[in-house]
Amino acid sequence: MGILCVNHRYGCQTYMGVKYMNLWENYKLALNEILPDLTFGRSWGSWKSKGTYLLAKTFTHPHIIKSREVEIWNEKSCIYNNIIYPKTGSNLPCFGMDLMGFFDKKVIIVFDFQHPVEKYSFSVDGLPVYEGDYRFFEIGNHFSKNIYIAKCTMSEVDEHLDMFKTYLTKYKDMLELEKPTGVDTSEYKDFDTYMTKLDPVSGYLTGKFGKEQSESLVHDFLFEYGVVAT
């Protein structure tokens, strides 16, 4: 049986001939509007298991090594994860977004400037400083003082869209000011290794797609520049 759009107010799109909930549609549109030079790179994976779908893709840009995104969805949930890795040589942070709609009443929105250097204190003037419960996120270690974390319902996700646009526009300004051109991906080794250990959805992925596929996604796609623990 095909996946149905759970609630029409969230928007729908079609994949493999079936409609599915597109909870983060306006966030993805904002990404394309603010960074219009993002160009499709490759499709890494397209999976279906236990009624859950996954798409993993990369995009490139004159000043970005890659923007790698993964979308995971089923009848009840819709998750969008993306990290933008800037080209090197200008000491710029990555820009990460974890947009996680697990079910109608449990949605977690996170976006931030994520610096690849360990214990590097990074902040942006004019943006809010987060003072709540960090849980997974260690402020000052690959996460900035401006990390944005919100919990809401599915009907409330667009209430945070303007702030998302503000953060992403600040990031675009950094790219345009510095115009990085380096492609030394070794600069992201520590960052990806740290993120691999931190990954909050690995258990969810294993439950849906099995351990082997889940580990491949994490090590070969999400955090491919990291060191695999032995």
Segments from the language model and where they lie:
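Short Lys/Arg-enriched alpha/beta "domain-start" segment
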Residues: 17-95
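Alpha-helical oligomerization segments
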Residues: 181-230
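Extended, non-transmembrane interaction/recognition domains
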Residues: 81-180, 184-186, 193
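Alpha-helix boundary/N-cap detector
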Residues: 18, 22, 155-162, 166, ...
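Surface-exposed polar/charged interaction patches
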Residues: 37, 41, 170, 174-181, ...
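N-terminal amphipathic/basic-hydrophobic helices that include classical n-h-c signal peptides
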Residues: 1-19
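Histidine (H) residue identity feature
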Residues: 8, 13, 61-63, 115, ...
